[in-house]
Amino acid sequence: MNKLIRMVPGVLAVVAGVPALAGEKIQLIEHADTDATLDLGAKGDSVGDLLTFANPVYDAANKTQVGSDQGYCVRVIAGKSWECFWTLRLKDGQITIEGPFYDAGDSVMAVTGGTGKYAGAKGSMKLHSRDAKGSSYDLTYELL
């Protein structure tokens, strides 16, 4: 029993060490097909409005659908930014995201966790609009 107790901390150190995904970069393209804005604040674009979505996600070549994402954003600064929470669903697991989404320019959000292959994931995700309409986005996940 004493040997088992001494072994467990070593095993925990290996399990809690650097994940196998460290340094992995995932490049995807989201098609913003279902984005819907709910006008919950003052009439028009205002603090408190809600943006919801459940969109297909494609490989970096924009040819094959490899998953989907779904989530919501709350308007925090009218005409400027949202605070978002969403889940990317891929074949081998999920990655959760949280952070600001800016109306203009790129956004960088935190990877806050995951499931399956991505269990314990952390890092960042850069979001870049591919066009002025916001109909598709480059998503670059950098896992630590």
Segments predicted by a language model, with ranges:
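N-terminal signal peptide c-region/cleavage motif recognized by signal peptidases
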Residues: 17-18
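Intrinsically disordered, low-complexity, mixed-charge
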Residues: 11-13
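Targeting-peptide/extracellular-domain and disordered-appendage signature
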Residues: 4, 21-144
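Bacterial N-terminal signal peptides that target proteins for export
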Residues: 1-8
